[in-house]
Amino acid sequence: MVGRLLDSMTLGRKARRLVTLITLLVLAACTSREVIVEGSFPTPLVDPVPVSVGVLFTQEFKEHELVDDATGRGEVSWRVSTGTAQVEFWSTLFPAFFQNVVFIESYEDLQTYDVDAVLIPKVADVQYAIPLYTNVKVYEIWMRYNLSLVEPEQIIDEENASISLENMQPFAEWPLTAYGKTPTAFMQSDIDAVNLAAVMALRDAGANFITSFLRVPGVMDWIKNPEEAQ
């Protein structure tokens, strides 16, 4: 009788341990991870395009983040903040690519600085793919941008002394895609792997911008006659 009681108690303890272990595994699977993308972005060596460009980073662009709530799927949820890295990267590339660049922060900047056009980048979409095997930390990230070139007057709201993008009519508008992949399967953490994939995607975006810009419809005509952009 005593032996049966002890066996029952032992089984009970094992069952409780098993339940605890399963609970911990479920909680681990449903945790969330946050990445604030940061990396090194070398200045590209290119012959500058002979125009003066204002660059406008919207608040949405500066604060861009990818949020994937995977709790319903029993997977890890991700929040990947790319905004700061986006601004840092493009703030390095644009001044190297154009002869003169002014970063537009306000209505007063548009009134003060004489630029041929204003370039407005927008992150249209970011997607990611997780590894098939948990011990292989290779992530993939896709980015898609919409870029617009517009005459400065198009975004000036004189009545409210502000910048308005509501009714702008760009004379050049085009999509830009980028892809990044963690270059090694031996990263120390998933967070590091996602960060590096995002950095690679940003660098790819820059390379694609440099090689495709002069082929965008309307751009060459504008470069030849910046005063006559339509």
Question: Whereabouts are the PLM-identified features?
Answer:
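A structural "domain/chain start" motif
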Residues: 30-92, 211-230
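Sec-dependent bacterial lipoprotein signal peptides
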Residues: 1-30
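Surface-exposed patches in mature extracellular/periplasmic domains of secreted proteins
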Residues: 102-109, 219-223
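Short acidic, glycine/proline-rich loop/turn micro-motifs
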Residues: 66-71, 131-133, 185-189
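Surface-exposed short loop/turn segments
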Residues: 31-36, 106-173
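Sec-exported extracytoplasmic/periplasmic mature domains
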Residues: 94-103, 206-218
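Short secondary-structure boundary motifs at beta->alpha junctions and helix caps
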Residues: 74-82, 152-212
